[in-house]
Amino acid sequence: MKKLLIILIVALSLNGFAQQKELVWHTDLNKAINISVKTEKPLFFFFTGSDWCGWCKRLVKEVFVKPEFATWAAKNVVLVELDFPRRTPISEDLKKQNRELGQMFGVRGYPTVWFVTPQVTAGKVNFNKLGSQGYVAGGPKAWTAGANKILKTK
């Protein structure tokens, strides 16, 4: 009986791990736009300095790696990481894409998250800015509360 109980507990535990949402961070803007258009979810542009920005690392540690955030993100947005690393090499195309988007959205500090909806017309993309936010203390609940206020404008 004890053996059966242990097997049941292990099976239920593994099932819980399998159901946890796995975050998918896109770096290919065109792919993310296509997903956003198909799912009718806004884009979540995360402007970060992943290997040097302390506040970016803190936001990731306190919010983005938490199961509550993963569940919220899967339901509400298409995640796009726009990284500006100093020590980690990235392709020239990715550097150019990230730099152009940073200029387009007037990013002056990190971390910055922009919520936008893409509008594709005749092969051209325009972004409708919904709003932005940076680091918010209080974990996933506080951060997603601010994000939800922005998303209500869509």
Protein language model regions, located:
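Typically the conserved alpha-helix immediately C-terminal to a functionally engaged Cys/Sec
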Residues: W55-A74
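A short beta-strand-turn-helix
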Residues: W25-L43, A73
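Solvent-exposed loop/turn segments at secondary-structure junctions
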Residues: S50-C53, V63, F84-P89, R108, ...
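Non-catalytic, surface beta->alpha helical segment in thiol-disulfide oxidoreductase systems
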Residues: E62-F64, E100-K154
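Sec-dependent N-terminal signal peptides
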Residues: L4-S13
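Sec/Tat signal peptide C-region and signal peptidase I cleavage site
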Residues: L14-Q20
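Thiol-based oxidoreductase modules, predominantly thioredoxin-like and allied folds used
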Residues: L23-H26, T48, F69-K96
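Short active-site neighborhood of thiol/selenol oxidoreductases, capturing the structured segment around
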Residues: T39-C53
